[in-house]
Amino acid sequence: MAATRTASKNTSAISPQSGRISFAKIHEPLEVPNLLDLQVESFNWLVGNEIWQSRVDAALAEGRTDINTKSGLEEIFEEISPIEDYSQTMSLSFRDHRFEDPKHSVDECKDRDTTYAAPLFVTAEFMNNETEEIKSQTVFIGDFPLMTSKGTFIINGTERVVVSQLVRSPGVYFEKTADKTSDKDIFTCKVIPSRGAWLEFAIDKRDTVGVRLDRKRKQNVTVFLKALGWTADRILEEFGTHESIRQTLEKDHGVETQDQALLDIYKKLRPGEPPSRDAAQQLLENYYFNPKRYDLAKVGRYKINKKLGLSLPFDQQVLTVDDIVAAIHFVCALHEGTAILPREGQDDIVVEPDDIDHFGNRRLRTVGELIQNQLRTGLSRMERVVRDRMTTQDIEAITPQTLINIRPVTAAIKEFFGTSQLSQFMDQNNPLAEMTHKRRLSALGPGGLSRDRAGMEVRDVHPSHYGRMCPIETPEGPNIGLIGSLASFARVNAFGFIETPYRKVVDGHVTDEVVYLTADEEDRHVIAQANAKLDDDGHFANDRVLVRQRHGEADEVPSSEVDYMDVSPRQMVSVASALIPFLEHDDASRALMGANMQRQAVPLVRTEAPFVGTGMEYRCAVDVGDVTLAEKAGSVLSVSADLIDIACDDGTYQTYKLEKFRRSNAGTCINQRPLVKVGQRVEVGTPLADGPSTDNGELALGRNMLAAFMPWQGLNYEDAIILSQRIVSDDVLTSIHIEEHEVDARDTKLGAEEITRDIPNVSEDMLANLDENGIVRIGAEVGTGDILVGKVTPKGETELTPEERLLRAIFGEKAREVRDTSLKVPHGEEGTVIGVRIFDTENGDELAPGVNQMVRVYVAQKRKISIGDKLAGRHGNKGVISKILPVEDMPFLPDGTPVDIILNPLGVPSRMNVGQVLEMHLGWIAHSGWDITQAEGDWAERLREVGLIDIPEESRLATPVFDGATEQEITGLLQYGHPTRDGEMLVDTDGKATLFDGRTGEPFPSKVGVGYMYMLKLHHLVDDKIHARSTGPYSMITQQPLGGKAQFGGQRFGEMEVWAMEAYGAAWALQELLTIKSDDVPGRVKVYEAIVKGENIPEPGIPESFKVLVKEMKSLCLNVEVLNSEGQEIDLRGSEEDTRSGLGIDIGRRPGADNAMAD
């Protein structure tokens, strides 16, 4: 199972790619693997392309046997072949699948709302078994969605990700549970296939061995063995040493022969059906021994062989009698308390119950396998169609094409990509969000757990997660622990188990040979930590080494007993967690928030890489594909905003096209900027262009800001943040957001809709920005209610007046009755039109049925930071901006530099995320630089050894997770930082400075911690949340305003608020709120009229909710009458319609909408 490779050393303190200065002390023999391999390699295996084939050939050349030599599609076509008719006179088989080129490129598919797919063809052979005649044909199976180079799929124009699923592996499992009625333990064994019926053995409190077939009624195991053809003597010969089997055999009264046993089993499995020996034999055969009905899969066979000590071939994917016998032996040994089962010439079998949450028993279904399973479903449906057609068609006229109906296959694929819980709309907030989404592991989904039934155990961190699944990064809320993230160095093997790399240790000497181990292999070894001290020869420096042994227990052992050592201190965490500097100083729950909030950071207009990073920034940005890298070495010929031309050394020319202002799935802006100049020399892998949230090829989610930890006038109470006006005016935290607005012109029953500039009852001012076709011009500034696309819809014919009839008789044309259904800017939005796309059936564009024309308008909005926006650091330290102070009012340093941001110091101690304080100090050190030529102490000696002696200002530092800058180094470097031009040190050796109050110029009484912190602007922007309504839509039944910004709803004045009004005795205000401001329908129309005309507000009437209550009571056969003060009955049917039509007022309209009332 284990794969090895020898790695090269990399001991430089300055990264050759990003130029970061690293404080790492531990030599890592292995680079982080490509972070998208989880997705890309799995899909390559499925389609069996050249990349996959070359990897297989290389692995076979190395002599490895743990790899798949068949592609996923090849496996599935072999599995279904041959399809035979019921009389087995003819068969259909498939081989040699191939793809043709996709119809459209990735960009065209996004533009046209189509799926990026390639036509899949397969050679189908029809064989007449009687004449042995073969007809061969190439058959089209359907359009097969392809994965883009970034590991995503384009489905109907949107980018989607298929998430890998964590499921229980097929195999054999032994469990020990306490009996509720007695103090005995009950031992069970479950044989779980990939598909097919379960087989369960159990030893109950009476010490009898029972078996359960396909979760039906329990029966004695000896009956099952007899049904398989065993005699009582043979059972005693094989299992005579087990008392429980002998007891069970004694209880088998009346079941002696195989026939009796089969009938007995059939009665329990199919009660009510007449039993027969053949039917029983067939049923048992289909349950466990028919490859069409039962499949352990290779992984199931591998697990059973491993657990029970068998050596059956991997292609034996149904149960065998050997499996059943070995499982019974094992469960009996477990019941008897036997520790090991000896085997001749091989390792002994350890007898112990299984831990279902162990990663040796949970495997990943990656993209390829998930699609393969879906294809299997589609092909099995197609198989039924083929069989039916074989029986109905003339055998002479049959060709493969006439037998095959591809609809079930294409429907299965479409259903999976469109509606499956595991095919998700890609989180595209920033490159890290994309990366994390592609590396996500979900225990939910079809065949997995459901969040309601998942208990604590399955959600908890398990020792076997080490190096495989991140213990930190998981969502907060109901999915906690069910959704995880793949660890940085982990990979998935051919069986779907997650492997993690270790350095091999031979007699206390740590080699650079890297071995990948699965969780159950790792359990057998003694493993040292990555930070175990080594001498110059690579031997352990200490005689006893801290290690972890079986079940993750820590212990100290002699160095000669160590088998392996971790390759890196960060191998246990995911990419997002590995981006948090000083993670080791943060509390786990805050680190979780920090990892999750980095994914919510919005790409900024001006990006800046962090002063204090972890060294993972470059790999993350490059692997996700947002940074354009040079594919060949050469020199730059020309550079423009959207094209880079390179003359390559091999005499060829390459052009790189850059993305410009494209909308992401999250509504953020994807824009690339060139990094190279004309004439510049580039090597392979040189970053040519930055993408969103990247800076010189490094991930840059936020900005470095000069932070002070101090209270300020109570404005940073409860984590609120005070910001300097400079951040607003210099566009430090400004982002661009792009909204897409779409309208289509359809055929209606009354005629076709039309996109036009000629809109009834609209002033010329409103049409100023529209072109002659009624579509807004690019560059126009638009606000709420402005028309983007003019559209009219035909109205129903109305009764004509005599005058109109006369005009029509003279001019001979129909009066044009249309209503305005134009696309308008929704409420609360504004911006600049940056793009218009027009699709028309006349130009050959494919549109939905009944749609003649579709127009898409892109509106970009520049959002400066404002009060109410949410900011966060990388340590789970989040807050909302409460005040933006003028620069002159901000506290300033002794040299006059005002700070950018004021944070509350009380946000640190109770949250236990001290990493932010260390980041702030190291940020100041990075900003000011240092010179430790004269410094003394071990810390200075170590930094001098790696060449970090005189570092300039504004340097970028890396402090890797669990191997970063120490407290001694930070306090030492604060002492030896470069002074200002005046020769003074602004920040003392304790990291604090004397700050002055910007309003008075007086120094604050205490010194304040000051330094540079990396702050992120999160997607929770106040512009998306703030909302107000004057008039708007009402609910159909209650006639009360709708709720929520999306429905343009009102603010609910709830039960408790009514109590508050009652408490204050504000009777008139309360009456207004409960009637005319809510659901007194005629009243609110009259009030609107009174306000317009400047009259007094009329008396409120009866609210609609009261009428609904009366109706409810009438439905219970209670005749409720409402009387006025004179005792006369009030008619509740009201005159709301009369009032509305009389006044010509409709206050139920939504601004910018054409619907009169919403439900």
From Swiss-Prot:
GO terms for cellular component: DNA-directed RNA polymerase complex. The keyword Transferase applies. Keywords: DNA-directed RNA polymerase, Nucleotidyltransferase, Transcription, Transferase. Residues 1132-1159 are annotated as: Disordered. Pfam families: RNA_pol_Rpb2_1, RNA_pol_Rpb2_2, RNA_pol_Rpb2_3, RNA_pol_Rpb2_45, RNA_pol_Rpb2_6, RNA_pol_Rpb2_7. It is an enzyme of class 2 (transferase). InterPro entries: DNA-dir_RNA_pol_bsu_ext_1_sf, DNA-dir_RNA_pol_bsu_external_1, DNA-dir_RNA_pol_su2, DNA-dir_RNAP_su2_dom, DNA-dir_RNAP_su2_hyb_sf, RNA_pol_bsu_bac, RNA_pol_bsu_CS, RNA_pol_bsu_protrusion. It catalyses: RNA(n) + a ribonucleoside 5'-triphosphate = RNA(n+1) + diphosphate. One of its GO terms (molecular function) is ribonucleoside binding. Its EC number is 2.7.7.6. GO terms for biological process: DNA-templated transcription. The RNAP catalytic core consists of 2 alpha, 1 beta, 1 beta' and 1 omega subunit. When a sigma factor is associated with the core the holoenzyme is formed, which can initiate transcription. DNA-dependent RNA polymerase catalyzes the transcription of DNA into RNA using the four ribonucleoside triphosphates as substrates. Belongs to the RNA polymerase beta chain family. PANTHER family: DNA-DIRECTED RNA POLYMERASE I SUBUNIT 2. This is DNA-directed RNA polymerase subunit beta. The gene is rpoB.
